[in-house]
UniProtKB/Swiss-Prot annotation:
Annotated domain remarks: The presence of a 'disulfide through disulfide knot' structurally defines this protein as a knottin.
Disulfide partners: 6-21, 13-30, 20-47, 32-45
Tissue note: Expressed by the venom gland.
Name assigned to this protein: Toxin CSTX-11
Function, in words: Spider venom toxin that shows calcium channel blocking activity and exhibits cytolytic activity by affecting the outer leaflet curvature and/or pore formation across the membrane. It blocks L-type calcium channels (Cav1/CACNA1) in mammalian neurons at nanomolar concentrations. Furthermore, it produces a slow voltage-independent block of mid/low and high voltage-activated calcium channels in cockroach neurons. Potassium ions, histamine, M-ctenitoxin-Cs1a (AC P83619), CSTX-9 (AC P58604), and CSTX-13 (AC P83919) synergistically increase the insecticidal activity of this toxin.
Keywords: Amidation, Calcium channel impairing toxin, Cytolysis, Disulfide bond, Ion channel impairing toxin, Knottin, Membrane, Neurotoxin, Secreted, Target cell membrane, Target membrane, Toxin, Voltage-gated calcium channel impairing toxin
Entry's family note: Belongs to the neurotoxin 19 (CSTX) family.
GO cellular component labels: extracellular region; membrane; other organism cell membrane
PROSITE patterns: SPIDER_CSTX
Localization annotation: Secreted; Target cell membrane
């Protein structure tokens, strides 16, 4: 999807799991969680940066800083 119609980071993507926006390097992924509210259990999803993507972004950032000079 284009930038204007994608779902931003930390926004709900329960009904449209393939529409997360692109982050710095990678597209956010729709991650789902079980929410228990009283006796009712529902599934809620949000666009997030997975841990391995965060680590890759950090490595690229460190690499750029090392070779900036």
């Amino acid at each position: 999807k284009d930038k204007e119609n994608c779902i931003g980071k930390h926004h709900e993507c329960t009904d449209d799991r393939d529409s997360c926006c692109k982050g710095k390097l990678f597209r956010y992924q729709c991650q789902c969680f079980k929410v228990i509210d009283g006796k009712k259990e529902t599934k809620r999803c949000a666009c997030v940066t997975p841990l391995h993507y965060k680590m890759a972004e950090m490595a690229v950032s460190v690499f750029k800083k090392m070779f900036k000079n």
